[in-house]
């Protein structure tokens, strides 16, 4: 089989797509996000967490990223659980007026989220015809995971070619996104007067902002850690490409770190627990392949603001740690967005990255 029978450019482009915008929902009708050939001039992005929601209005034109507005809203209690909408009515009540007052109604919208229900696996498959790819991928996933793949939307990112015993194999990063979550967000965006355009996952959002703002200054293997209230999302980049992702669910809520900062013992217990989980993740990554070594850690998200966290992680992990406090190659317009640039950029990286559309 000749390599030119496979459109590798198409496979690589899939790596620049979000978790599929064209989704067939397991219901009576098909629910579709807008097609990629109609990229809007500007978008509204929503990074919906269990404690806070970040809303960003911006545009990505000719490799220029412009942020017009940044808004923070509190997520109603128990309305988002593990990336799923559990109380649509409370969430709608919290957001619909904010969207309207900010003049965002009717704009194309992108949601960036994460969930332990999203399956992310690296698979190695033999060289096959392009038309056979999804069938082979589904077969490989089904071998290891006892799930009904008909309930998932499958997306794959081509990573590299490897040769074993003169046989060519492909390494793919495969993401399986529950279709019911896609439908929930699609319906929700319509109900808050936004035009559903795309559904993203947080590690893909950070991958895009990494490529746009950090890649030129990064060498070796770098771990980005989104330190949220209920979970930490780890994205590891190796030689400029995303190589590994993992969600760490917090055994104890990090809300106490933000609302009851004086509770020293609770804070220490939480940070100790998180650090141990990070050690396990990094050890697993290092053991995956010879030469996998984390050389630098960048932290962001709400919990990254905990006093002395950077120094503590450095001492425990023996790796250089930096808190993200600015990003390159981004223009901020408007009072609120300029304030975010100066004081809160670490809270908005996922939402800003989701503005980037290819």
Region annotations inferred by a language model:
Residues 1-358:
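Hydrophobic/aromatic-enriched cytosolic interaction surfaces used to assemble or bind macromolecules
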């Amino acid at each position: 089989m000749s390599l030119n029978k496979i459109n590798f450019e198409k496979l690589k482009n899939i790596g620049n797509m979000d978790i599929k915008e064209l989704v067939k929902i397991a219901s009576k009708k098909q629910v579709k996000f807008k097609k990629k050939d109609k990229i809007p001039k500007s978008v509204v992005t929503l990074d919906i967490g269990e404690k806070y929601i970040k809303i960003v209005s911006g545009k990505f034109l000719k490799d220029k990223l412009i942020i017009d507005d940044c808004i923070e809203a509190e997520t109603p209690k128990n309305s988002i659980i593990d990336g799923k909408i559990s109380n649509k009515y409370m969430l709608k009540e919290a957001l619909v007026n904010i969207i309207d007052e900010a003049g965002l109604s009717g704009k194309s919208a992108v949601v960036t989220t994460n969930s332990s229900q999203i399956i992310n696996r690296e698979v190695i498959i033999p060289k096959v015809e392009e038309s056979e790819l999804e069938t082979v991928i589904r077969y490989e996933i089904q071998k290891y995971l006892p799930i009904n793949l008909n309930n998932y939307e499958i997306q794959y990112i081509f990573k590299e070619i490897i040769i074993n015993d003169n046989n060519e194999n492909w390494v793919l990063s495969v993401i399986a996104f529950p279709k019911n979550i896609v439908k929930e967000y699609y319906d929700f965006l319509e109900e808050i007067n936004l035009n559903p355009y795309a559904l993203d996952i947080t590690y893909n959002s950070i991958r895009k902002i990494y490529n746009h703002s950090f890649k030129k200054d990064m060498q070796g293997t770098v771990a980005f850690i989104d330190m949220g209230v209920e979970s930490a999302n780890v994205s590891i980049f190796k030689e400029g490409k995303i190589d590994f992702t993992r969600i760490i669910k917090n055994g104890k809520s990090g809300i106490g770190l933000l609302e009851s900062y004086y509770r020293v013992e609770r804070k220490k217990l939480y940070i100790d627990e998180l650090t141990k989980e990070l050690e396990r993740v990094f050890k697993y990554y290092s053991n995956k392949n010879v030469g996998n070594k984390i050389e630098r850690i960048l932290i962001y998200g709400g919990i990254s603001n905990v006093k002395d966290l950077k120094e503590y992680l450095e001492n425990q992990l023996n790796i250089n740690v930096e808190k993200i406090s600015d990003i390159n190659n981004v223009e901020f317009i408007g009072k609120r967005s300029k304030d975010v640039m100066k004081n809160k950029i670490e809270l908005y990286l996922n939402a800003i990255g989701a503005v980037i559309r290819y």
